[in-house]
């Protein structure tokens, strides 16, 4: 087991103990993120699915459990939840996980968050919805926080990189 894995597992134990005495949306975010990290470094599909399921439960519960939660924290929880579902999609190739990602993030587009737009484009391209991919990428590229390197290197966007409109959409 690598040092990083040991550190993550140790921190999971610590945060799970904190959950018993002092739960908060921030703690749920950390607990979910730790499980997402384990899912991404695991080489076992069964382990990945287990950690993703745990992360999803923690993040979804935190989104609905608290009456008063700052919008920025709600967006972070939602983005982590969307990431978990898209990792699920990458493992299973089941389009329903991309659809769930869209359902989670669409209501948050009012915030004009680059990461929300990116994940919506990622979910759309995963479902082969090229018009919606173009729409969300257009919004993403208009935000100051867009990352061209990420867009160019992400394998999910390979099908649209060759599209006639793609180079025109990129900022000069």
Where are these predicted regions, by residue range?
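N-terminal intrinsically disordered, low-complexity tails enriched in polar/charged
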Residues: 1-25
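Short coil/turn connectors between adjacent alpha-helices in alpha-solenoid helical repeat scaffolds
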Residues: 1-7, 36-54, 85-98, 128-131
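TPR/TPR-like alpha-solenoid helical repeat scaffolds
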Residues: 72-86, 147-168
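Boundary/linker segments of alpha-helical solenoid repeat arrays
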Residues: 64, 68-73, 109-116, 143-153
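Sterile Alpha Motif
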Residues: 111-144
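Alpha-helical repeat scaffolds
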Residues: 9-18, 49-65, 93-108, 131-140, ...
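Amphipathic alpha-helical repeat scaffolds of TPR domains
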Residues: 9, 21-43, 60, 68-90, ...
